[in-house]
Amino acid sequence: MEALRNCSVEIQAGEFVAIVGPSGCGKSTLLNMIAGFDTVSTGDIHVDDSLLAAASHPPRPGPDRVVVFQNGALFPWKTVLENVMYGPLRQKILSRSQAKEKALDLLRNCGRLDAVAESYPAQLSSGMQRRVEIVRALMNDPRVLLLDEPFRAMDTVSKTTMHQHLLEMYRLCQKTIVFITHDLEEAIYLADKVVVMTTRPGMIKKIISVRLPRPRVPEMLSSREYLEMKREAAEGIHEEAKKAFERGEREQA
């Protein structure tokens, strides 16, 4: 089954890009191809001048691209600090003392998470666990941070809080971020541009440049510029949802 077709998008270094579209349109497939988890049947993917994936090039995951998935992936038997230190120690790119210093610095700068450094994941709220996972991803100093609907299961208040934490992390690290979401409000509020995809096979329907200044604040959600961009994105999504419905497609997670 063809998941994606003619998907061409250029992402600048340090840019925050959100990808939205109907369920089953290939958003997560695209992210997995960038990550090096899925095979590319046609076309290619580059980061800077490096070829990451192509039809003749086997998938190649690497520390330059780190994924934070929908479901939690912290090691329950390790403390927060041990979880964050895990990547560089496993790859033997930092000594234990260097890894500890870097981990504590990241935790401190990302919402004072150093206060729970010796806690275990089960002792943290779901929102705090998500923040630790993002810090652990940043610990590997990736060029690209890939976020696959990380806040999907959260209530509105928790999600709003996480948005502010993520925006602060982005301000501090200035990494390139690819963010998959179903939530148009979330996509526009967080990103520099929003890629709207069609129904399966997923193609890029439109790319919306977000005309909101940084730093982002919740009051922007009621601004005229925001509401215009949300309407534009929603129209594209609704058109694709109608096409899927008329073809009798069943929603896929």
Model-identified regions with their sequence ranges:
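The feature captures the beta-strand-to-loop junction immediately N-terminal to the Walker
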Residues: 20-22
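Helix-to-loop junction immediately C-terminal to a conserved catalytic motif
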Residues: 35
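Conserved ABC ATPase "signature" region
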Residues: 51, 96-115, 168
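ABC ATPase NBD coupling module
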Residues: 51-69, 90, 96-97, 219-222
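Short helical segment in ABC ATPase nucleotide-binding domains corresponding to the A-loop/adjacent helical element
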Residues: 81-90, 100, 104, 209
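Conserved signature/switch motifs of ABC ATPase nucleotide-binding domains
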Residues: 122, 140
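Hydrophobic anchor residue at the start of the ABC signature
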Residues: 134
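Catalytic Walker B motif of ABC-type/P-loop ATPase nucleotide-binding domains
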Residues: 145-148
